[in-house]
Amino acid sequence: MDYFTLFGLPARYQLDTQALSLRFQDLQRQYHPDKFASGSQAEQLAAVQQSATINQAWQTLRHPLMRAEYLLSLHGFDLASEQHTVRDTAFLMEQLELREELDEIEQAKDEARLESFIKRVKKMFDTRHQLMVEQLDNETWDAAADTVRKLRFLDKLRSSAEQLEEKLLDFLISGS
């Protein structure tokens, strides 16, 4: 049973997140291992396994990029374990340049430049994310898979920039 079916939701990217949360809570109550404490060992094991599946499904469906990857996996794209990556050389060059810029910002400890960088990367991510949503809605799976691969790069870059932001904040607070 796929995660969408488990939660009684249509297999599409855009979800009713409130319905997802409510269904998660219902499933947690229904299959909580403590409810099966007096059951047979097989029932206890089944409850633990079902609970683990519910938690994994919840983590996957509530995170937008993971949900997109999962939806694509249902259509034959195993992005989590695939070997090939983005083939768009212009995009890859842009990523290298952005990484170099982030390194320069770190060396200079330039908080204002970092703030501007983070905003720029967020805008790039949001633009590609909107494109991905349209591609998934239109069931253009190949294009959506390519966009998800690019979003992974941007997500990692954004995460690195936010970690640097925390590091610079700690540096400024400690004064060293």
UniProtKB/Swiss-Prot annotation:
Q: GO biological process annotations for this chain's record? A: [2Fe-2S] cluster assembly; protein complex oligomerization; protein folding
Question: What is an example of a GO molecular function annotated in this UniProt entry?
Answer: protein-folding chaperone binding
A GO cellular-component term linked to this record: iron-sulfur cluster transfer complex
Q: Which residues form the J domain?
A: 2-74
Sorted keywords for this record are: Chaperone
Tell me the superkingdom of the source: Bacteria
* Main function: Co-chaperone involved in the maturation of iron-sulfur cluster-containing proteins. Seems to help targeting proteins to be folded toward HscA.
Q: Which HAMAP family match?
A: HscB
UniProt name for this protein: Co-chaperone protein HscB
- What is the native source organism of this protein? Escherichia coli O7:K1 (strain IAI39 / ExPEC)
The opening ranks of the lineage are: Bacteria, Pseudomonadati, Pseudomonadota, Gammaproteobacteria, Enterobacterales
